[in-house]
Regions:
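Conserved phosphate-binding/catalytic region of the ribokinase-like
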Residues: 60-65, 90-180
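Ribokinase/PfkB-type carbohydrate-kinase core domain
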Residues: 1-73, 77-127
Length: 180
């Protein structure tokens, strides 16, 4: 149902608190209303659950909300909208990452489409190339990436291996029409 994510209530969020107590990660995206996202982030942090924010679809975010994020995963357009830095290469990606770090984020991934993924983690910053495929339909590639990322991290893979795995899933998702 279009727009259903914008109707999530405080009561519905509080109903998942027990899940957040047991979870290692929670993935938030900006299609959900801001109040619900902020409450999930607050509860997750309270219970030691790492908050990963997929900044899609773009919507303004507060510094307070970002301060609760362990990791952010914007694409290059979303990163520019949030930080004001046009992300075109490694150096500009580092500048955008600094914006997130200044707000308390611990790890920054910026997806760059066919150019790969900028990863900033533990003082190491680089662009990991993506798999070269013929893209037919990119709808849902970000969702595939983020789902793969969380699956790999939940299995205990390090961020570098998790990004490669997530990139592989995103590459698979774009090769046919309607793979979302």
């Amino acid at each position: 149902v279009p727009g259903a994510c914008s109707t999530i209530t405080e009561e519905e969020v509080k109903n998942i608190e027990a899940v957040l107590k047991e979870a290692e990660y929670v993935l938030l995206q900006l299609e959900v209303n801001q109040e619900a996202n902020e409450l999930v982030a607050e509860l997750a942090c309270k219970h030691g659950c790492k908050v990963i924010v997929n900044t899609a679809p773009y919507a303004p975010v507060t510094d307070e909300f970002l301060s609760k994020a362990y990791m952010v995963t914007p694409n290059e357009v979303e990163a520019e909208e949030i930080t004001g830095v046009p992300v075109k290469d490694l150096e500009s990606a580092k500048k955008a990452a600094a914006y997130f770090y200044d707000r308390g984020v611990k790890e920054v991934l910026i997806t760059l489409g066919s150019r790969g993924v900028f990863v900033s983690s533990g003082g190491r910053e680089e662009i990991i190339p993506c798999f070269k495929v013929e893209a037919v339909d990119t709808t849902g590639a970000g969702d595939a990436f983020n789902g793969g990322l969380l699956a790999a991290l939940s299995e205990g893979r390090d961020i570098w291996e998790a990004v490669r795995f997530a990139s592989g899933l995103a590459a698979l998702s774009v090769q046919k029409m309607g793979t979302t």
